[in-house]
Amino acid sequence: MRRLLVTLLLFTTLAATACRSKTATLNLLVWEGYADPAFVRAFEESHHCKVSASYMGSSDELVAKLRGGSAANYDVISPSSDVATMIATTGLAAPLDLAKIPSYSQLAPQLTSLPLVKSGGKVYGVPFTWGPNPLLYDTTVFQQPPTTWAVLWDPKYRGKISVWDDLSTVYMAAQLLGYDKPDPGHLYSLSDDELEKVKAKLLELKPNVRKIWSTGGELTNLFENHEIVAAMGWPLMTNQLRQAHFPIGETIPQENTTGWIDHMMITAASDHKELATEFLEYLVEARTQKQVADVTGYIPANPGAAQFMSAEEQKNLHLDDVQNYQKRIYFWQNVPRRDKYNEIWNEVKAAQ
C-alpha cells in the first residue's frame, strides 16, 4: 500500500512538473513600455513562460476591445484611472487574491486606498505607475520651457504641433478655458455648452497641428524628423528621445495638467489566472518597479523602489517632493458622459 502511495505521489509530482514546464503565454493589452524586455525577460525565464504584449493608444481603445469580444484574447490589462472602475464593476476583470500578491502591502497607501478598482469588498487591480501628460518641446526652438498650454495655439508654430488622439486633448483645452476652476474634477463632467466651447477652442488649434498621434512611436518620430516642435506627450517619450540624444524638454505648464494612475488587472476571461497573479506580484515588487521607472520615466506605485535609485534618479522622478508634484496633476476620473466627449473630439478630428 505504501509503495502504491509513493508511486501515486511521484506520478502526481511529475505530472504537475510537466504541466508547469509547458510554455504558457501571458497575453497583455497594456500601455507602451509596460512589457519591456528590460524587466519582463527575468519573469519569463524564472517562470518558463512567454509574455506577449499588444499596445493600446488610449483608454477608449482598451474598452472597445474588451467590450467588442476580444477580452478572451488577453490575460493582463493596464487600465488607467478613467476606466478602471468601469472594468472592475462590469465583470470584465477577475478579483485578486491579495494573499498571493504580498508586495501589495508595500504600495503607496494613497493609491491602494482609492476606490478605483474595488467593488463588493473585492480588489480587482494593483496600482502600477502614475504620472502626468506633460508638454514636450524641442529645446533648440525653446530656450526656456513654455509656461502655458496656449503655446500650442501660437500662429508661429503653424503645422509644427502634435496632439494626442485621446480625451486628454479635450481636457487640456478645457483647462485653458478655465473649466478646472475651482474644481479640477469638473474637467470630467463638462456641460454641453462647455463642450461646444472646448470644441471651438480645438478647432482654432487645427491649423497648427501637423499630426494627431496615437502611439508613442509616432510622436518620437515626429520630433526626431523635426516635423514638430511641441506636443502633449508622456514621460516615456521624453526618456526615449533623450536616449536617442534628441534635445527634448518636458514641463508642466502654469495651468497644470491631467494625468493617470495605471493599474494592472487580470481579465475575467483569462485561462492563466495563477500565472497572471504571479506576474502582477513580480511587477509591483520594489526592484521591478525601479526597472519599470528606468524604462518609462513614470513614478512607481511602490515607494520601496527608491532604495534602488540614486539621489539624482529620485529627484528626476520627483520622489523627493511627491506631494507637491501630485498637486500639479489632475488625475483622470470616470467620465459619465464619455460618449459625448468622444463625439466632440471626433468632430474636431473630422473638421477640415
Specify the residue positions occupied by each region the protein language model found.
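A ligand-binding cleft/hinge motif common to bilobed small-molecule-binding domains
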Residues: A84-M86, M232-P247
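Conserved C-terminal helix/tail region of periplasmic/extracytoplasmic solute-binding proteins
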Residues: Q323-Q352
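Early extracytoplasmic/lumenal segment of secretory-pathway proteins
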Residues: C19-I87, T220
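Extracytoplasmic ligand-binding site segments that recognize negatively charged/polar headgroups
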Residues: S78-A84, A88-E224
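Short, low-complexity disordered leader/linker segments with a strong preference
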Residues: M1-L26, Q352
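Mature extracytoplasmic/periplasmic domains
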Residues: T258, T267-I329
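Periplasmic-binding protein-like
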Residues: L195-E196, K201-L205, R242-A268
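Paired acidic/hydrophobic, glycine-rich loop segments that form the ligand-binding mouth/hinge
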Residues: Y74-S78, I212, V229-W234, E250
